[in-house]
């Protein structure tokens, strides 16, 4: 049996020597995980640094970084609305493709749905060989299975990995089932912090 994440086509397809990687970030899931596991007070991670670090460690050629998040309504929560508006704008100047929508009561299903659709759509259109998903949301297992079926139908080699925050003292955490699970420890996380604080000062 192939290891988790290794998705085969109808036959034993050849592993490409250069693996095109797309990194998909579930922004809110990563933030809440950082808050619980590492005690971070705000989303201080840098998606570009994280994606580059893991891609380099794995020998993958990072092609694109995609970031998805809900944003609170500016009237209901102006603090976090402005934080995300500024952080997303900064990401855009660095080539990150961002997707956001206004959400209420922290309901992010529309955002998660878009991320899952993009993972599947970009597999079908052969845009990547590796999907690196920064999330622990098990709702994405369905998208992973669809990518697996795409690999079989198109007789292609595709790898799906999920990166998640890990601290032994916190307890058991894991990535998305059916993927290669990549741990991000505190040392790696601290090396990939965004130096800019986008919080509005009072």
Q: Which residues does each PLM region occupy?
A:
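Nuclease catalytic cores that cleave nucleic-acid phosphodiester bonds
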Residues: 93-202
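Domain-level signal for Mg2+-assisted phosphodiester chemistry and nucleotide/NA-binding surfaces
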Residues: 2-109
């Amino acid at each position: 049996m192939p290891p988790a994440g290794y998705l085969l086509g109808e036959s034993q397809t050849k592993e490409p020597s250069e693996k095109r990687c797309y990194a998909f970030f579930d922004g809110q899931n990563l933030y809440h995980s950082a808050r619980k596991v590492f005690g971070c007070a705000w989303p201080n991670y840098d998606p570009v640094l994280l994606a580059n670090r893991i891609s380099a460690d794995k020998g993958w050629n990072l092609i694109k970084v995609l970031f998805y998040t809900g944003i609170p309504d500016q009237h209901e929560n102006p603090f976090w609305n402005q934080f995300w508006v500024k952080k997303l704008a900064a990401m855009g100047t660095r080539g990150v493709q961002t997707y956001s929508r206004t959400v209420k009561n922290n309901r992010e299903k529309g955002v998660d749905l878009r991320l899952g659709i993009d993972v599947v759509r970009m597999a079908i259109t052969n845009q990547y060989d590796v999907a690196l998903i920064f999330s622990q949301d098990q709702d994405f297992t369905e998208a992973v299975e669809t990518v697996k079926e795409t690999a079989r139908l198109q007789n292609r080699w595709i790898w799906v990995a999920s990166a998640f925050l890990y601290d032994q003292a916190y307890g058991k955490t894991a990535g998305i089932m059916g993927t290669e699970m990549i741990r991000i420890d505190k040392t790696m996380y601290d090396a990939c912090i965004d130096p800019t604080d986008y919080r509005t000062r009072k």
